[in-house]
């Protein structure tokens, strides 16, 4: 039985074991997947022990994604640009490959909702690790532009500079945003504390799609704000969670599981249905 895991701190609430166990059942893959809570200062020891004892691959969540980036022997292009790793795989020659599947998870979720990205104007709110992880996969969908805004403008500017070689990316001060966008993505965790970004609702219009990377029971505060401002549709990040897991599973096993049934199960659990 091949061994996989997710590392984090804390890790008790992780949905990854549930998701990957269902993926394994669906694809008839002989594997086990467990959650491992590494000490805050003990990730490297924990992950080294895991691979030394037959581990095939693992997911990495907060606060260890940057450490996993340093730990990997080899990095995919999307991991290099993300500056963080959420997926590690032990190759046949013993090399540990680091990848980042977060952005692909977001894009796949948007596409399954039939949200058009090509030639669209995208607003990305936030310039932290979550934003950095999704920029390259979003740019590969050929939007007309991606505008990055952040509470600290300099962080948005630095991010736009890194990714401008890959497509039309610009940084704008939050106070200078005066028009609407086709797709608005909130990459901040503000919704978890019931807060909204300090930006004008002019970003929304009747045809806009809102996407909040956070999720919970019912609408997030960001998506409720978007709906109150007449967006066409609003989605949360639960599908991104399942999408990045499906991409990790594909990296490990070479075949892609279906996300739809698992997403339905998770949504039911979340809503207490």
UniProtKB/Swiss-Prot annotation:
InterPro entries: Aminoacid_DH-like_N_sf, NAD(P)-bd_dom_sf, SDH_C, Shikimate_DH, Shikimate_DH-bd_N, Shikimate_DH_fam, Shikm_DH/Glu-tRNA_Rdtase
Reactions that this protein is recorded to catalyse: shikimate + NADP(+) = 3-dehydroshikimate + NADPH + H(+)
Keyword field contains Amino-acid biosynthesis: yes
Keywords recorded for this protein, A-Z: Amino-acid biosynthesis, Aromatic amino acid biosynthesis, NADP, Oxidoreductase
Binding site for NADP(+): 77, 126-130, 150-155, 213, 237
Active site: 65
Pfam families: SDH_C (PF18317), Shikimate_DH (PF01488), Shikimate_dh_N (PF08501)
Listed GO biological process terms: amino acid biosynthetic process; aromatic amino acid family biosynthetic process; chorismate biosynthetic process; shikimate metabolic process
Annotated pathway: Metabolic intermediate biosynthesis; chorismate biosynthesis; chorismate from D-erythrose 4-phosphate and phosphoenolpyruvate: step 4/7
GO CC, any one term: cytosol
EC number: 1.1.1.25
GO MF annotation list: NADP binding; shikimate 3-dehydrogenase (NADP+) activity
Keyword NADP: yes
Record family assignment: Belongs to the shikimate dehydrogenase family.
NCBIfam families associated with the record: aroE, PRK00258.1-2
Subunit structure: Homodimer.
Name the UniProt record assigns to this protein: Shikimate dehydrogenase (NADP(+))
Organism of this sequence: Aliivibrio salmonicida (strain LFI1238) (Vibrio salmonicida (strain LFI1238))
Organismal lineage: Bacteria, Pseudomonadati, Pseudomonadota, Gammaproteobacteria, Vibrionales
Gene from which this protein is expressed: aroE
